[in-house]
Amino acid sequence: MLAFCRSSLKSKKYFIILLALAAIAGLGTHAAWSSNGLPRIDNKTLGRLAQQHPVVVLFRHAERCDRSTNQCLSDKTGITVKGTQDARELGNAFSADIPDFDLYSSNTVRTIQSATWFSAGKKLTVDKRLLQCGNEIYSAIKDLQSKAPDKNIVIFTHNHCLTYIAKDKRDATFKPDYLDGLVMHVEKGKVYLDGEFVNH
């Protein structure tokens, strides 16, 4: 009974934190919640969250060359020229509020190119585990975070990874477009989904 009460209190405490997060997000966006039920977290809100604890932001890669009529950057398995411009624009806006972060990507051309253009000059670490989009993704995130517990992390991955996380953590249907993202954090060995990143 005591264990149940402790668990219930912990759940209530976390729910209250999530409500507070949604309220904070509402200060920076016109709507605090996306239509998929995820809290909306814009750049300024993300910056405030990062002051409370390190954040993990996962982005879908930029526009794929093999699924677009736009000009390819180079390799057909990579991204388009438009994709590089979009990634650079996103990176500039992101870095204005969170300049210090470690950068990772899965081992595909499109994620590597997206991460490179997102943050020109920053060291990029390629990790093939970030291509695995089941429970394994959480182990990879926790491992990366444990290497530098006080650092923010940016990961470039794939739409099916983001879809899986949103469904698994919040029972939300999330169909990310290019460069859409999710905001997470690791606390006491557990990975939490805070909401959907909205670039404003």
Swiss-Prot record:
Main location: periplasm
Biological processes per GO annotation: lipopolysaccharide metabolic process
GO cellular component: periplasmic space
Cited Gene3D superfamilies: Phosphoglycerate mutase-like
Cellular localization per UniProt: Periplasm
EC class: hydrolase
Keywords, alphabetical: Hydrolase, Periplasm, Signal
UniProt keyword annotation of Kinase present: no
Database matches in InterPro entries: His_Pase_superF_clade-1 (IPR013078), His_PPase_superfam (IPR029033), LipoPS_heptP_Pase (IPR011310)
EC number: 3.1.3.-
Pathway(s) it belongs to: Bacterial outer membrane biogenesis; lipopolysaccharide metabolism
Xref: SUPFAM superfamilies: Phosphoglycerate mutase-like
GO molecular function list: phosphatase activity
Signal peptide: 1-25
Source domain of life: Bacteria
Described purpose of this protein according to its UniProt entry: Catalyzes the dephosphorylation of heptose(II) of the outer membrane lipopolysaccharide core.
NCBIfam families xref list: PRK15416.1 (NF011945)
Family to which this protein belongs: Belongs to the phosphoglycerate mutase family. Ais subfamily.
Xref: HAMAP family: Ais
Protein's UniProt name: Lipopolysaccharide core heptose(II)-phosphate phosphatase
Source organism (scientific name): Escherichia coli O157:H7
Gene that produces this protein: ais
